[in-house]
Structure formats: structure tokens, C-alpha cells
Design a protein with these regions (language model features):
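Conserved AdoMet/S-adenosylmethionine-binding subsite of the radical SAM
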Residues: 1-121, 127-128
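Radical SAM enzyme core and accessory elements
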Residues: 155-165
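A generic structural signal for ordered secondary structure
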Residues: 83, 146, 150, 159-161
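A structural motif corresponding to the C-terminal lobe/cap of the Radical SAM core domain
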Residues: 102-105, 111, 127-152
Length: 165
């Protein structure tokens, strides 16, 4: 993230009455994001996996920074939306969604928890770049499976938003 550029852009938007938001995976050190906070109206951030071993296997990094940043941002007073991209066979388990929802419940200032159904449109981008898509052939969850995961998350007592197949 180009922190200085982003900060200046957000500042100018705020000065001109334009609403501001940032979407992040929270993997950067908090100090890189901290300067943006005075200029944000809301944040969107992903929590993909609660299990650190799985998170390392899938993303290549620990989720310790992600979870710590989620807590720090939630306590900053800026309204937030927490999201989980539902990747078939990876992030779409009952255990994972339940664990994330339980964590989200502890965070203040979260407007809602959003389950983002898998979108295979990225496959074409990979092919165009001559790259292998590790998710090739995977499809969005069916309505019933998505609803079941949403119900698991709702059992934590949080507001859950999800899209259809």
C-alpha cells in the first residue's frame, strides 16, 4: 500500500465532502495504516482463516498480524465490515466460519460480517496472464450451503450479510 499517497488522497476526499473507505487484508504492520484512520469513514477487511497453520499454508503468512490489526482497527472507532471470501474447500467450513464469527463478535464498531461467495471470474485473468489458477474449476456455493454457513455465523449473535449463488 502506498501509505503516503493513500493518506493524501483520503485527506483531500474528506476536505471535499467525499466519503472514504479502505479495503484491506490487514497483513501490513498497523503503523502503515494508522495514518489513514483520521480520514476514513469506514473500513472493509478480510479475515480468511482463523487457524494459523491453515492461514500460513493458504496465504504464506501468519494470521497473527491480521487478527491483531482487526482488534486495533475495531477499537479505533471507525465503522467496519468484516468479510470472508468463501473459497471452496478452504475457507468455507463450518468450523472456520464459526470461529471467525465468534472473533467478530468481540470486535466493537463492526457493522456486519459478510460472507462473499466464491467468484470464478478470476480464472480468465490468470489464463490471460499465462498463469495457472489454483482455484480453476471451483464454483460458487449453492444457496443452501451459503445459507447454512450464514446460520452458523448468526449463531454468534452478529449481523451476517451474504449474497446468493
Amino acid at each position: 500500500m502506498q501509505a503516503e499517497f493513500a493518506r493524501e488522497l483520503l485527506k483531500r476526499c474528506r476536505e471535499n465532502g467525499i466519503g472514504t473507505a479502505v479495503e484491506t487484508n490487514l497483513s501490513l504492520p498497523f503503523e502503515r495504516m494508522e495514518g489513514l484512520l483520521p480520514y476514513l469513514d469506514q473500513m472493509f477487511f478480510d479475515i480468511k482463516l482463523m487457524d494459523d497453520v491453515q492461514h500460513r499454508q493458504v496465504t504464506g503468512i501468519s494470521n497473527a498480524t491480521v487478527l491483531e490489526n482487526a482488534q486495533r482497527l475495531a477499537h479505533s472507532g471507525i465503522p467496519a465490515v468484516v468479510r470472508t471470501p468463501l473459497i471452496p474447500g478452504i475457507t468455507d467450513t463450518v468450523e472456520n466460519i464459526g470461529a471467525i464469527a465468534s472473533f467478530v463478535r468481540t470486535l466493537p464498531n463492526v457493522r456486519y460480517y459478510e460472507l462473499l461467495n466464491f467468484n470464478p471470474l478470476g480464472e480468465e485473468k490468470y489464463r490471460a496472464l499465462g498463469l495457472t489458477c489454483v482455484h480453476e474449476g471451483k464454483r460458487p456455493l449453492k444457496k443452501e450451503a451459503l445459507l447454512a454457513l450464514a446460520q452458523v455465523a448468526q449463531e454468534s449473535g452478529i449481523r451476517v450479510v451474504y449474497g446468493q449463488e
